[in-house]
Amino acid sequence: MAITASMVKELREKTGAGMMDCKKALTETNGDMDKAIDYLREKGIAKAAKKADRVAAEGLAYVKAEGNHAIIVEVNSETDFVAKNENFQKLVAELASHLLEKRPASVEEALEQPFNGGETVQEYINSAIAKIGEKLSLRRFEIVEKEDGDVFGQYIHMGGRIGVLSVIGQSSDEELAKDIAMHVAAINPTYVTRDQVSEDEVAREREVLKQQALNEGKPENIVEKMVEGRLGKYFEQVCLLDQAFVKDGDQKVGKYVQSKGATVKEFIRYEVGEGLEKREDNFAEEVMSQVKK
């Protein structure tokens, strides 16, 4: 399989590895991105890549709660300048309020809904595009329902670059819920508990860690014990309750929440532009010059 500049670029962004290391990894794995990531990790060249870690597009993440329902939404713009525009910020807030009230099932359904009794949501966005002068788009949203004895946590970081919505069970402690949301914004866990990590993912991680240990020249009779220890570190990276609490590093999030008589039911974290690729003028040429060598 031919290794393209865009493939090298994607692997480089996902792993932080050097250009030629990325090219070699892709060549050795016949262009399989996931296997190339594992190859680099086994060689000790790259750390675990988080899912959807390419952040490039601009816009705002926004969180709003009313009663037992809350919404987290992302609206994209082309530039950071527009994301700071008051008219754009008003648009995002109005869209969030509308979506929370009408509760459409998808972005497609939302765009076709009447807005303020007249134009559709898409037409409302189009009129904003005409005024602001940039392409704007409702990228995604999620509406969450809680029970009466639960509490929502909301946190917006960097003026809307990151938004988090948390649901804390058996509690009315809004400060606790916000603190958990803030932790999620800062540390970016993938799961609440270890139980949510699939068996396939754990098996894949265990194999990568085993190859790492063997490549380090460790004796086979202690490799398994090392793997289990390192697997614990992996869970600390991806599972919220296993992580050191960002406001008190001596305490795990799980123990802290438990001390408050509460539970973490779920969280949703939006980082503006994650998974989207930004146009770059010269990078592709730089990569190709290396790939062709």
From Swiss-Prot:
InterPro entries: EF-Ts_dimer_sf, Transl_elong_EFTs/EF1B, Transl_elong_EFTs/EF1B_dimer, Transl_elong_Ts_CS, UBA-like_sf
Any Pfam family the entry gives: EF_TS
Gene3D superfamilies, A to Z: 1.10.286.20, DNA helicase RuvA subunit, C-terminal domain, Elongation factor Ts, dimerisation domain
Main location: cytoplasm
Annotated region described as Involved in Mg(2+) ion dislocation from EF-Tu, given as residue ranges: 79-82
Cytoplasm listed as a keyword: yes
A GO term, aspect molecular function: translation elongation factor activity
Keyword Manganese: no
UniProt similarity note: Belongs to the EF-Ts family.
Its job: Associates with the EF-Tu.GDP complex and induces the exchange of GDP to GTP. It remains bound to the aminoacyl-tRNA.EF-Tu.GTP complex up to the GTP hydrolysis stage on the ribosome.
Stated name of the protein: Elongation factor Ts
